Amino acid sequence: MRFDVITLFPEFFATPLRIGLVGKALEQGIAEVHCTNPRDFATDKHRRVDDEPYGGGVGMVLKPEPFFAAVASLPRLDPCEIILLTPQGQPLNQALLQELAQKAQLILLCGQYEGFDERIRQHLATREVSLGDFVLTGGEIPALALINGVVRLLPGTVGKIDSLRSESFETGLLEYPQYTRPPEFQGHKVPPVLLSGDHRAIARWRLQQQLVRTWRRRPDLLAKRPLTPEEQQLLAEGLAEQHTDVEEQDRCL
């Protein structure tokens, strides 16, 4: 898969793209990332990529010519998306990452200053994506997040496919709690079921924990995911058990 990042700060991506699973995926050729500076396509002697907004206002607006020219200079693979990173865009979530992972090429437009000339938004970008309801100094951090999230879904990046299937959001639920050695630390014990060797009981416990954790932390996810009768029962039992545990802790205080 090919990523092309249109950015005024190509050096921003150097170190993050060399480390971890993403770095290994790039080394193995699973994906490739190319950075293009729109300043190289500026049309004046000062290589300006921004100008004052028509109608007045604060800040500077990114000009259309350098961005259109930068994108036009790129080789194209099909299917391709040209993504503008903006707080006004579609929220980046796991479902969108999975959709984008099916593309052959993603071109990411990183903004700076007061934002983009509207013609970039309307006539160049094919999609707008937001990292969340907050404003950053530029689109580079959202671009890194998107690249990371997509690359790890590409075949060969993550060793065990089951690792992806059991993660938060893959099944519409948050991930279950994880434990490792030692079995007891500072008086806090690993749940006995995880030490039992009973794989069916472990799977049931994990699903119950996912349901309870999602209900408590992200109830909006459950609103989008109808529960089976078994899941409804597991959720009710899990909530009841946690309520009992809280009451017992209160009595010990």
UniProtKB/Swiss-Prot annotation:
InterPro entries: Alpha/beta_knot_MTases, tRNA_m1G_MeTrfase_C_sf, tRNA_m1G_MeTrfase_TrmD, tRNA_m1G_MTases_N, tRNA_MeTrfase_TRMD/TRM10. One of its GO terms (molecular function) is tRNA (guanine(37)-N1)-methyltransferase activity. One of its GO terms (biological process) is tRNA N1-guanine methylation. Signal peptide: none annotated. This is tRNA (guanine-N(1)-)-methyltransferase. It catalyses: guanosine(37) in tRNA + S-adenosyl-L-methionine = N(1)-methylguanosine(37) in tRNA + S-adenosyl-L-homocysteine + H(+). The keyword Transferase applies. CDD domains: TrmD-like. S-adenosyl-L-methionine binds at residues 111, 131-136. Its EC number is 2.1.1.228. Keywords: Cytoplasm, Methyltransferase, S-adenosyl-L-methionine, Transferase, tRNA processing. Homodimer. One of its GO terms (cellular component) is cytosol. It comes from Synechococcus sp. (strain JA-3-3Ab). Belongs to the RNA methyltransferase TrmD family. The keyword Aminoacyl-tRNA synthetase does not apply. Its main location: cytoplasm. It is found in: Cytoplasm. Coiled coil: none annotated. Pfam families: tRNA_m1G_MT (PF01746). It is an enzyme of class 2 (transferase).
